[in-house]
Design a protein with these regions (language model features):
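His/Asp/Glu-rich acidic catalytic environments and adjacent acidic regulatory segments
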Residues: 4-40, 44-45, 99-301, 402-405, ...
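C-terminal, non-catalytic "cap/extension" segments appended to globular domains
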Residues: 4-36, 40, 225-227, 374, ...
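Membrane-entry segments of alpha-helical transmembrane domains in multi-pass membrane proteins
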Residues: 26-38, 61-68, 263-267, 306-313, ...
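Secondary-structure edge/capping motif, primarily at the C-terminal ends of alpha-helices
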Residues: 48-59, 83-94, 157-160, 258, ...
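Long, charged all-alpha helical bundle/coiled-coil segments in cytosolic proteins
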Residues: 55-134
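Short, hydrophobic/amphipathic alpha-helical patches that form generic packing surfaces
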Residues: 77-89, 147, 151, 253, ...
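Active-site-proximal, well-structured secondary-structure segments within enzyme catalytic domains
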Residues: 141, 145-146, 177, 184, ...
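Short pre-active-site segment immediately N-terminal to the catalytic Zn-binding motif
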Residues: 462-481
Length: 695
């Protein structure tokens, strides 16, 4: 006990942060603080569970479902969520070997702890009692919490016998370890590869920004020349602009064969095992497949609806996608000779040439107009136009890396709304891609105080150099808007319970706020607010904006089918009814072939790096990106009709969708905003897809 008291005095997780808005004191947290904080959080959770279970009073919503301490009136389970939020955020954005060791050690302990709660027979009996005999009329939010609590326990094995519960523990603990190993393997493989160029002639075709970034990377590694990596800001321009076909092939093969090699980072067997573990888990709980288990709590509701969406999209988009690819192939043959055979590492290069030929437009032409600082102003300004909120950088708020900026966010009435962190650039120990996360969620405490969220957007944009500020592509502007949309969902949260707050919604609804915001990237009136040349200050010319709008559907059908192919692959794995024994690489090619137009190489593999469905929560859920696209096109059509900055429409979207989190069924929330259920029509119209109706 003495050790614990010492820890209580020194471990920053155990004492009030005493920082602006109770933000995380990153500079005070050391690696050795995490494990004791996790263990103390688990101890406090166990103590809280015992209090609920042994409460002599009849189970009620307050003493059992809301998990309120009857003596102190406080909510239970605060410490563990506090340390877990920080640790998981750091594992993605600022990890190191020591953190990965902590994760390996804590992962099975935390999984066991979660199972100890959900498989606690006495606790479930109390929850079931309240579920079957509510002690009073419940609000819709309380009813949702009661239903999700009860169903969460059932879905976690509460109705199983002891043998079944033990089996469930084994399955979840193994899956937890394997997802962690999958992610660590992928990070190591991606960071291990570099293309080191010392002959300047091999940079032919590359834009200055790509060359400068590669020179900067080489300098950081104390090497001569230029270094290209598999991080998207380095990889993408190389594949788009490099005239060196063999080097493009080298980059493509490196990126598309990661975690398939004969080394410790091979993910093939891990993926196979994860598919089987999830199938076993679902069948243990009475479902035929893992997809059936997952879709029970999705807007799609069942596999038939998912396949209908994916197949409808294939039918609508495939003819146009085939034409798009043939156009690229025709241009390649025109430039290289009729015997030229296009390979996967050529597609980005020649499709870019086609884009230039058709629209005289490419990402690099726009980059000078998208200086990151100005884009930030534009995005914040958009939020102000729509919702009246303002952002103010506060250097007193601690950050975990010098690249990170922290802002206070204020509502239209001037009241404090949230803390917003932005982490823009790639670095060692940071996962690729882009995401939104939270260091603190939103809820209303026992005294009625509205605890406001601390949200973070993490991206990997091209870094500034000595000569140039950070300049974005239009695609990166879209990425920023996407993650910012998620953050608005978090920042506008206004619910009583944290587990129903912000982005804690059904998985095929969570992408609506993010994809909705992407629509603004090609809106003329939005671009005019921030797109100025970083050197001359000249605004983005109208004729360039017109070309952006005209080219917005360039390769849209091909892009749609690519996403659909990922959805098909996901469903193929998670609709397995028997043990999955196939070889991953050929199985993958078969699973998505009806949505594939370009031929693939037999040795490449997506599955082993498909974090979304293997380690990221999108298992049997990848279709939700396309599902949300139907929603976002439908929702944005209201803004197009009423005005893209219309505050009344924006307020309705905030009140009925963004602030409500998961407190009601998502379709109920959507219809309250839209007045009707969504249709696919707005998406087809946006992409200029004409469907031939049969009959």
């Amino acid at each position: 006990m003495q050790d614990n008291k010492i820890q209580n005095r020194t471990n920053p997780f155990f004492v009030p942060y005493n920082t602006p808005h109770d933000t995380v004191p990153f500079e005070r947290i050391r690696l050795e603080d995490y494990e004791p904080a996790f263990m103390e959080g688990i101890r406090r959770d166990d103590e809280a569970t015992d209090k609920i279970v042994n409460d002599p009073a009849e189970p009620t919503f307050e003493n059992t479902i809301a998990r309120v301490d009857p003596e102190k009136g406080e909510h239970y389970y605060d410490l563990l969520s506090r340390v877990s939020n920080v640790f998981s955020c750091m594992m993605s954005a600022e990890t190191c070997d020591e953190m990965e060791e902590i994760a390996q050690k804590m992962s099975p302990i935390l999984t066991k702890h979660a199972n100890d709660i959900t498989l606690n027979k006495k606790l479930f009996e109390r929850i079931k009692f309240v579920h079957d005999h509510p002690n009073r009329e419940l609000t819709p939010e309380e009813k949702m919490l009661l239903d999700t609590s009860y169903d969460g326990f059932v879905r976690s094995g509460a109705l199983l016998d002891e043998e079944g519960k033990e089996k469930l523990r084994e399955l979840t603990e193994e899956a937890s370890m394997l997802t962690l190993q999958f992610s660590q393997n992928l990070l190591k493989e991606n960071k291990a590869f570099t293309l080191h160029i010392t002959d300047e002639a091999q940079l032919d075709g590359l834009p200055e920004t790509a060359k400068a970034a590669a020179a900067h990377t080489a300098k950081e590694q104390e090497k001569e020349g230029w270094i290209f990596t598999l991080d998207y800001p380095s990889y993408s321009p190389f594949m788009t602009y490099s005239t060196q076909r063999e080097l493009r092939k080298q980059m493509y093969m490196a990126r598309n064969t990661v975690c398939t090699h004969d080394n410790e980072q091979n993910n093939l067997e891990i993926c196979k095992r994860l598919v089987n573990l999830r199938r076993e888990l679902a069948q243990l709980l009475g479902f035929e497949t893992y997809a059936d288990y997952v879709l029970r709590h999705r807007m799609a509701s069942n596999t038939e609806h998912v396949y209908k969406l994916l197949n409808d999209l294939i039918e609508a988009y495939k003819p146009t996608a085939e034409k798009e690819v043939k156009e690229v192939e025709a241009l390649a043959k025109k430039l290289e000779g009729k015997d030229f055979e296009m390979k996967p590492w050529d597609f980005g290069f020649y499709s870019h040439k086609l884009q230039m030929e058709k629209y005289n437009l490419d990402a690099e032409m726009l980059r000078p107009y998208f200086q990151l600082d100005k884009v930030i102003d534009g995005v914040f300004g958009l939020a102000n136009k729509l919702y009246g909120i303002t952002f103010k950088e506060n250097k007193e708020i601690p950050v975990y890396h010098p690249d990170v900026k922290a802002y206070e966010v204020f509502d239209k009435d001037g009241s404090y709304l949230a803390v917003f962190y932005a982490d823009f650039f790639p670095r060692k120990g940071k996962q690729g891609g882009a995401w939104m996360t939270e260091f603190q969620g939103q809820w209303i405490d026992h005294k009625g105080k509205n605890i406001r969220p601390h949200v973070s957007v993490v991206m990997n944009f091209t870094k500034p150099t000595e000569e140039k500020p950070a300049l974005l592509t239009l695609g990166e502007v879209e990425t920023f808007l996407h993650e910012f949309g998620h953050s608005l969902h978090g920042m506008f949260a206004n619910t009583r319970f944290e587990s129903l707050s912000g982005t804690n919604v059904w998985w095929d609804f969570v992408e609506l706020p993010s994809q909705f915001m992407e629509n603004y990237a090609i809106e003329k009136d939005f671009l005019r607010t921030f797109a100025f040349h970083y050197q001359t200050g000249e605004p983005l010319p109208d004729e360039l904006i017109e070309r952006i709008i005209k080219s917005r559907n360039f390769m849209a059908a091909y892009g749609c089918l690519r996403q659909v192919s990922f959805g098909l692959l996901d469903m193929a794995y998670y609709t397995q009814k028997k043990e999955f024994t196939a070889d991953i690489i050929p199985y993958e090619k078969e699973a998505w072939k009806k949505a594939m137009i370009l031929p693939l190489l037999k040795e490449t593999c997506m599955t082993v790096q498909f974090s979304h469905i293997m380690a990221g929560g999108y298992a049997a859920g990848y279709y939700s990106y396309k599902w949300a696209e139907v929603l976002d096109a439908d929702a944005f059509s209201v803004f197009k009709k009423n005005g893209i900055f219309d505050q009344k429409t924006a307020q309705s979207f905030r009140d009925n969708v963004l602030s409500k989190g998961g407190t009601e069924h998502p379709m109920t929330l959507y219809k309250r905003f839209r007045g009707q259920e969504p249709t696919i029509d707005a998406l087809l119209e946006r992409n200029e897809i004409k469907v031939q109706h049969k009959g």
